[in-house]
A protein has these predicted regions:
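Positively charged n-region of N-terminal signal peptides that target proteins for export
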Residues: 1-4
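Hydrophobic structural segments
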Residues: 6, 12, 17-296
Length: 296
């Protein structure tokens, strides 16, 4: 009888005070599906969610319960294995899972690598979602926010629209070396005079194509461009010719991953602001390239 009275009293409190009901739910732990997490993401980006987008599920069942979330730059096979070992069954990746922008798999029908990756995702009940277009489109751009934070260059940012920084004066070689150390990069490549003193730097992340890179380099207030990757026969040759003409220009290529991965580290922190009671962790993909000079 006493237990029944207590239950009725508690029910009455919840009816009178909806906030108490919310608190009780939070205290007992919220179960969410991957689809529900994505709906929260859609509600928290500042841009309108587009119907034509690569930001879709790439594997697994969106209606499965999320035990934990792993954010990553690339859902590599090793990243998937690490996520599984940590109990993080929902992987949010920035780049494709199946080696092409749209994650099309028809052309890989008999490919053993793709088949094994698909099988691993299925057998381990993992869910993979790509978060690319809207992470770039939200304001501020999530990848850029993470990169500026990792670089520690917020105080040097002079033009946020064109990502131009006024840095303490240093040589191109010293700047390239500092970037290599900052990102533990194994394959930084440079075009230009290593001894040239520079202060005005621009940042163009990822692989946007040559024209955004060249348009940045043609500015009078840009001496050195820090970029992810490029077509060597376009931006690289543009800078080589500019240097041959006596223009104060240089290009530092740090690799696509190194130019964007910090943004997915930041994504994990961003998600924690509105996804509660679910473990969220960033897993690095790691630089896939290596330099024979570094092999001992």
């Amino acid at each position: 009888m006493k237990k029944g009275i207590i239950s009725l009293l508690l029910f009455g409190i919840l009816l009178v005070n909806p906030q108490s009901r919310n608190n009780l739910s939070a205290n007992t732990g919220n179960k969410m599906t991957a689809a529900e997490v994505v709906n929260l993401i859609k509600n928290n980006v500042t841009c309108q969610w587009q119907s034509k987008t690569v930001d879709t599920f790439k594997g697994g069942n969106p209606d499965d319960e999320v035990k934990g979330i792993a954010t990553t730059f690339m859902a590599t096979f090793n990243v998937l294995k690490k996520a599984k070992s940590k109990g993080l069954n929902f992987i949010i990746t920035h780049e494709p899972t199946y080696y092409n922008h749209f994650d099309e798999t028809a052309q890989f029908e008999d490919d053993k690598v793709v088949a094994e990756k698909m099988r691993f995702i299925k057998e381990n009940h993992l869910i993979v979602f790509r978060f690319h277009d809207h992470w770039h489109t939200t304001n501020p751009d999530g990848i850029i926010s993470g990169m500026i934070s990792r670089l520690g260059w917020g105080k040097y940012l002079q033009d946020k629209n064109n990502l131009i920084f006024v840095l303490p004066e240093m040589t191109v070689k010293d700047l390239a070396t500092s970037l290599q150390e900052k990102f533990n990069a194994t394959a930084v490549r440079v075009v230009g005079d290593p001894g040239m003193e520079v202060t005005n730097a621009a940042l163009v992340v990822g692989a946007p194509g040559s024209m955004p890179q060249i348009k940045s380099l043609e500015r009078d207030d840009v001496e050195v461009l820090i970029a992810g990757e490029t077509h060597e026969w376009e931006t690289v040759e543009y800078v080589r010719d500019a240097v041959s003409m006596g223009k104060k220009k240089a290009l530092i290529l740090i690799g696509h991953l190194n130019s964007e991965e910090a943004g997915m580290d930041y994504c994990a922190k961003w998600l924690k602001g509105f996804v509660k009671d679910i473990p969220i962790e960033f897993i690095t993909s790691g630089d896939p390239l290596w330099n024979p000079q570094l092999i001992k």
